[in-house]
């Protein structure tokens, strides 16, 4: 039997595909290589996976019924990471985000129902908490006050997963990711964007006064959490859980800029701009539930994580012939 990873060519998806293949799993990767960012980056993300005979690559869109006809039937677990991501773009295009993240997820759930696939891990987001008054964020918070269309679509996805699980016997864990970073991070995300500007000698555009906080989670810790949740599902039939995966510590925006600049060996110039709509002031994960259910313990410090990211980032620039 195989694991189906949707969004397999993306940041988290490509790392997960490699991890599973390295551990001997049969993996099916579904991706539409959309133009949200450069598709050639996503192509490179799967270069190593394509070296494995146990990897089946399927090009298709989760909104397209024909994409599901291309998939093999021998699938027992789905890790659903395909989505339109990002808070600010969702404000500009709420209908597009609904179409991919809500309708696309519903079509995937229908596919699982038709084939009798028993287990699902759904990639959700810390953004569902909005500006939660309860810190750190706990899974039993209502999560009913999202402040962006993206957050609303992720909460809608969690609820649809619950409904399908109840009606059709799909066991599921919804994983609320907290600001994931590391090699292959999407180029539109802050750490990657700031690194690019720092390397080019440009000022960092900081929205707000720099005191907003994020719980940054290194990609390896996220992969450990996903795999822990997969094992938990295998031994826990009848499950529906919502679980935080975070670093369990916060870093201010201003401190993040300093850490990234230090890792790159440069001094930052900061241009202060007004705060942007849809951005939450703080994220902070209570990960005690993940630890209790499947032993999740984030281990990569922000200092070490930014060092690893900078090493990868500079290597990528060197390979592309970009220096300084």
Where in this protein do the model-derived segments appear?
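N-terminal Rossmann-like NAD(P)+-binding domain of SDR-like oxidoreductases, especially those catalyzing
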Residues: 1-180, 223, 300, 316
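C-terminal substrate-binding subdomain of Rossmann-fold SDR/epimerase-dehydratase oxidoreductases
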Residues: 16, 22, 60, 198-324
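Hydrophobic alpha-helix immediately C-terminal to the catalytic Tyr-X-X-X-Lys motif of short-chain
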Residues: 156, 160, 164, 194, ...
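A short, amphipathic alpha-helix embedded in the catalytic core of nucleotide-handling enzymes
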Residues: 108, 164, 193-198, 225-229
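Residues that scaffold the ATP/ADP-binding catalytic core of kinase and kinase-like folds
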Residues: 36, 131-132, 183-184, 207, ...
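Conserved donor sugar-nucleotide recognition element shared by glycan-biosynthetic enzymes
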Residues: 149, 157, 187, 253, ...
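A glycine/serine/threonine-rich, flexible loop-to-helix segment
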Residues: 135-136, 187-195
């Amino acid at each position: 039997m195989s694991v189906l990873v949707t969004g397999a060519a993306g940041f988290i998806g490509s790392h997960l595909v490699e991890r599973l293949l390295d551990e001997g799993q049969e993996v099916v990767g579904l991706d539409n290589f959309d133009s949200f960012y450069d598709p050639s980056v996503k192509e490179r993300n799967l270069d190593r996976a394509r070296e494995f005979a146990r990897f089946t690559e399927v090009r298709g869109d989760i909104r397209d019924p024909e994409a599901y006809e291309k998939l093999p039937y021998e699938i027992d677990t789905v890790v659903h990471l395909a989505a339109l991501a990002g808070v600010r773009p969702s404000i500009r295009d709420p209908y597009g985000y609904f179409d991919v993240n809500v309708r696309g997820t519903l079509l995937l759930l229908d596919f699982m129902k038709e084939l009798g696939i028993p287990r699902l891990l759904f990639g959700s987001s810390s953004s569902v908490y909005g500006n939660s008054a309860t810190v750190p964020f706990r899974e039993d918070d209502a999560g009913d006050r999202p402040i962006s269309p993206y957050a609303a679509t992720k909460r809608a996805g969690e609820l649809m997963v619950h409904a399908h699980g109840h009606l059709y016997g799909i066991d599921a864990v919804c994983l609320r990711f907290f600001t994931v970073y590391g090699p292959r991070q999407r180029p539109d995300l802050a750490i990657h964007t700031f690194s690019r500007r720092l390397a080019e000698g440009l000022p960092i555009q900081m929205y707000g006064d720099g005191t907003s906080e994020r719980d940054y989670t290194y990609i390896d810790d996220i992969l450990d959490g996903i795999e822990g949740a997969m094992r938990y599902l295998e031994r826990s039939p009848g499950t529906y859980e919502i679980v935080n995966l975070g670093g369990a510590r916060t870093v201010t925006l201003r401190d993040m800029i300093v850490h990234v600049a230090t890792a790159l060996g440069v001094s930052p110039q900061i241009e202060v701009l007004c705060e942007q709509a849809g951005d939450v002031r703080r994220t902070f994960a209570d990960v005690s539930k993940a630890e209790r259910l499947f032993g999740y313990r984030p281990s990569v410090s922000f200092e070490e994580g930014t060092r690893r990211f900078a090493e990868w980032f500079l290597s990528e620039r060197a390979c592309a012939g970009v220096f300084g």
